[in-house]
């Protein structure tokens, strides 16, 4: 039983490492990429195409992406330069 739990734990860690980071997509000015007036499914396609993410959705009013490679920048409150 302990071996099984260890195996499951290792699989979860591998999944976390392989999946990548997550966050809001940014526009060219460093602001969150708006999905306010976009059609359904837009953010999933945008995240996959432009950020090489595994998926995305509209976390109203901005696109939120999952599985973003580490070298791709996503919006971060600490380094926010939007409107500055």
From Swiss-Prot:
CDD domains: neurotoxins_LC_scorpion. The lineage of its organism: Eukaryota, Metazoa, Ecdysozoa, Arthropoda, Chelicerata. Has the structural arrangement of an alpha-helix connected to antiparallel beta-sheets by disulfide bonds (CS-alpha/beta). Its main location: secreted. Keywords: Amidation, Disulfide bond, Ion channel impairing toxin, Neurotoxin, Secreted, Signal, Toxin, Voltage-gated sodium channel impairing toxin. SUPFAM superfamilies: Scorpion toxin-like (SSF57095). It comes from the Eukaryota. Pfam families: Toxin_3. Disulfide bonds join 31-82, 35-58, 43-63, 47-65. This is Alpha-mammal toxin Ts2. Negative results: does not affect Nav1.4/SCN4A, Nav1.8/SCN10A and DmNa1/para. Alpha toxins bind voltage-independently at site-3 of sodium channels (Nav) and inhibit the inactivation of the activated channels, thereby blocking neuronal transmission. This toxin acts on Nav1.2/SCN2A, Nav1.3/SCN3A, Nav1.5/SCN5A, Nav1.6/SCN8A and Nav1.7/SCN9A voltage-gated sodium channels, with the highest affinity for Nav1.3/SCN3A, followed by Nav1.6/SCN8A and Nav1.7/SCN9A which are affected almost equally. Interestingly, shows a significant shift of the voltage dependence of activation for Nav1.3/SCN3A that is characteristic of beta-toxins. It is found in: Secreted.
